[in-house]
Curated annotation (Swiss-Prot):
<dbReference type="InterPro" id="IPR023591">
    <property type="entry name" value="Ribosomal_uS2_flav_dom_sf"/>
</dbReference>
<dbReference type="InterPro" id="IPR027498">
    <property type="entry name" value="Ribosomal_uS2_euk"/>
</dbReference>
<comment type="subunit">
    <text>Component of the small ribosomal subunit. Mature ribosomes consist of a small (40S) and a large (60S) subunit. The 40S subunit contains about 33 different proteins and 1 molecule of RNA (18S). The 60S subunit contains about 49 different proteins and 3 molecules of RNA (25S, 5.8S and 5S). Interacts with rps21.</text>
</comment>
<dbReference type="InterPro" id="IPR018130">
    <property type="entry name" value="Ribosomal_uS2_CS"/>
</dbReference>
<keyword id="KW-0689">Ribosomal protein</keyword>
<dbReference type="GO" id="GO:0003735">
    <property type="term" value="F:structural constituent of ribosome"/>
</dbReference>
<protein>
    <recommendedName>
        <fullName>Small ribosomal subunit protein uS2</fullName>
    </recommendedName>
</protein>
<comment type="similarity">
    <text>Belongs to the universal ribosomal protein uS2 family.</text>
</comment>
<keyword id="KW-0687">Ribonucleoprotein</keyword>
<dbReference type="Pfam" id="PF16122">
    <property type="entry name" value="40S_SA_C"/>
</dbReference>
<comment type="function">
    <text>Required for the assembly and/or stability of the 40S ribosomal subunit. Required for the processing of the 20S rRNA-precursor to mature 18S rRNA in a late step of the maturation of 40S ribosomal subunits.</text>
</comment>
<dbReference type="GO" id="GO:0022627">
    <property type="term" value="C:cytosolic small ribosomal subunit"/>
</dbReference>
<dbReference type="GO" id="GO:0006412">
    <property type="term" value="P:translation"/>
</dbReference>
<dbReference type="InterPro" id="IPR032281">
    <property type="entry name" value="Ribosomal_uS2_C"/>
</dbReference>
<dbReference type="Pfam" id="PF00318">
    <property type="entry name" value="Ribosomal_S2"/>
</dbReference>
<dbReference type="InterPro" id="IPR005707">
    <property type="entry name" value="Ribosomal_uS2_euk/arc"/>
</dbReference>
<keyword id="KW-0963">Cytoplasm</keyword>
Amino acid sequence: MAPSQLPPMFNPTPQDIEMLLAAQCHLGSKNLQVHMEPYLWKTRPDGVNVINIGKTWEKILLAARIIAAIDNPADICVISARPYGQRAVLKFASHTGATAIAGRFTPGNFTNYITRSFKEPRLIIVTDPRTDAQAIKEASYVNIPVIALCDTDSPTDFVDVAIPTNNKGRHSIGLVWWLLAREVLRLRGTLASREAEWDVVVDLYFYRDPEAEENKEIAEEAKVPGADEIGAGAVESGFAGENWETQAPGAGVPGTAFAAASAAGATSWEADGADWAASSAAAPAESWAAEAQGAEGAKW
């Protein structure tokens, strides 16, 4: 990194430099656009152009000063048609109050006042000049300044402030937007001092695949505790470890109590049966015979 020409208070901290290197913000493409040559550090033997991250930091500070100079944050429009930058621009807009356009840019947003989505921003910030070419083209028609994250092969036509960085990686895009948002909040006074840590982690600005997150949640829900112990593994790990020889008092002899209860019950039922048999055999038989004989004698 070349010596910085900034005041000492604006110099990046070692942690900022480590984050820029870890996110691979310094790795450009193999192609080099002539207007991006001043931001080039060197070219590796494999042909990859390495960006000077000192220039990247200086341009982040310059862009933050331009953003902080606008009184109404809603007059700033942040745009990203590239999927890796859509989450970042939405988070940047929520933290700084800017207007976000994540996804497809509708032609005529800045030039056709009849459309419902017509906007008149004072400044636009784009993630990639190549994918957001329609927004830059319309901004040039109505004299709107443009700040763009530019790679070594990015076209710089109608771009007023180019932030040299890797605009193709999800981590590099998210980190640059996070650093830009933090610097804007510092200049506005939202953060108490430059030494104060921002409580928003940079991971919130990174792109996340919705399908991958959904599949991860489904896999976590499907994993039930103990599900891996079904089958032979359960016998070896769970049931085999238990002591099946241990018996509770009275265990293993279930017929003892049942036999005693059945014997007592049988005695009482036999006694009742004997009483019923005696009563039915004595009195009812005689009475029925007497009645039958009396009826026959009276009739004949």
